[in-house]
Design a protein with these regions (language model features):
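A structural signal for beta-strand boundary/capping segments at domain termini and interdomain linkers
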Residues: 78, 210, 259-261
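Extracellular beta-sheet/turn segments enriched in Thr/Pro/Gly and aliphatic residues
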Residues: 180-186, 262-279
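Hydrophobic beta-strand segments
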Residues: 212-219, 250
Length: 279
C-alpha cells in the first residue's frame, strides 16, 4: 500500500508562515473526532517554522526550517505508550483521543518535542497530517496546500519507491537516529554545513571595481576540491562544506594578472573572506 510522506525543501522556504496559519485555521476551535480534539489558540504549534543563520556580518544567510510530527515508522512515542498510538496503513501516526486524555507524559515521549499539551482540554495533541481531509478526498494537507513556493510537498508511494526517492533527491532526516521518519528534508546543507564567501576586485585609478568571470579555486591539503567563477558583483561562494573541515586555500586566477591565494579556516561557522585584490 502507498504511504504518505512529507518532503520539506530548505532552499524553497522563505519563512512566510503560511503553513502555520493554515494549520491554526484548520484546527483551532475545530474538533475532528476521531482524529483530534480542537487546538487552543495560543501556546501550541503543531507545525513550527524556525529561523536559523549561517555566517556572520557582513555576510549572513537565513534558513527557515519547518518542523512537525515526523510520523516515524519506528516512533519513540509508540514504544513508550503503544496503547496511545494509532498507526494507520498509510503511515500516518495519530494519537488515540481517549488514551491521550490526561496523559501528559506523552509530551515527553517524543524526542523532537512535537507532541503538545492542551492545558484547556487536558490532552496531548500533535499533527495529524490533516488525515480527516485526506480521508475525505483532499490531495494535500492544509500546510502543503498553503505553501506558495512548494517548499512542502506530500508524496504517496511504497516504501521501496520512497527509499529510491531518498537516494535520488538526497533526502535526509532532520535528526540522526533509527526512528525512520516519514517527514524528510531536502537541501539540509543550508542548516548543518558551512560556506566560504568572498569577492574579487581590482583597483583602477583609485576606483575599486568588481571583477566578473574570474576563476576561483578551492583546495584542501593541496588537493583541488571545487572551483567557480565570480559573478557580476565579483563575488564567489563555496558551499556544503562540513563543519570543522580544516584550513582551505582559495586561489584567484585571471589571465594577465598574478594569482592570489589566501587561507581560511572553517570551524563551526561559515567564513567571509572579504575582498581579494588582483594586480
Amino acid at each position: 500500500m502507498d504511504k504518505k510522506h512529507i518532503i520539506i525543501d530548505l532552499e524553497k522556504c522563505i519563512g512566510c508562515f503560511n503553513c502555520m496559519l493554515a494549520c491554526t485555521d484548520e484546527f483551532v476551535g475545530n474538533r475532528w473526532a476521531p482524529y483530534s480534539e480542537k487546538q487552543i489558540l495560543t501556546g501550541e504549534k503543531w507545525i513550527d517554522t524556525r529561523r536559523y543563520e549561517r555566517g556572520k556580518a557582513p555576510y549572513t544567510e537565513v534558513t527557515f526550517v519547518t518542523q512537525t510530527c515526523r510520523h516515524c515508522a519506528k516512533a519513540a512515542c509508540e514504544k513508550t505508550f503503544p496503547q496511545a498510538i494509532d498507526r494507520r496503513e498509510d503511515g500516518v501516526v495519530l494519537l488515540d483521543m481517549k488514551a491521550a486524555k490526561g496523559n501528559k507524559a506523552l509530551v515527553d515521549a517524543c524526542p523532537y518535542g512535537m507532541i503538545k499539551w492542551n492545558e484547556e482540554l487536558m490532552t496531548a495533541q500533535k499533527c495529524t497530517m490533516c488525515a480527516h481531509l485526506l480521508d475525505d478526498g483532499w490531495e494535500e494537507p492544509r500546510c502543503v496546500q498553503a505553501c506558495p513556493l512548494r517548499a512542502l510537498s506530500i508524496v504517496r508511494c511504497t516504501d521501496e519507491e520512497f527509499t529510491e526517492m531518498i537516494d535520488n533527491l538526497k533526502l535526509k532526516p532532520l535528526e540522526e537516529g533509527d526512528n525512520r521518519p516519514q517527514v524528510m528534508y531536502r537541501n539540509l546543507y543550508r542548516l548543518n554545513s558551512c560556506f566560504i564567501k568572498g569577492a574579487v576586485v581590482r583597483k583602477e585609478n583609485d576606483i575599486i571595481r568588481a571583477q566578473e568571470g574570474v576563476d576561483v579555486q578551492l583546495s584542501l591539503n593541496d588537493e583541488l576540491i571545487d572551483y567557480t567563477k565570480t559573478d557580476f558583483f565579483g563575488e564567489f561562494k563555496f558551499d556544503r562544506l562540513p563543519k570543522d573541515s580544516g584550513v582551505f586555500k582559495v586561489t584567484v586566477k585571471k589571465d594577465g594578472f598574478a594569482s592570489v591565494s589566501k587561507e581560511v579556516t572553517v570551524g563551526e561557522e561559515s567564513q567571509f573572506m572579504g575582498e581579494l585584490y588582483i594586480e
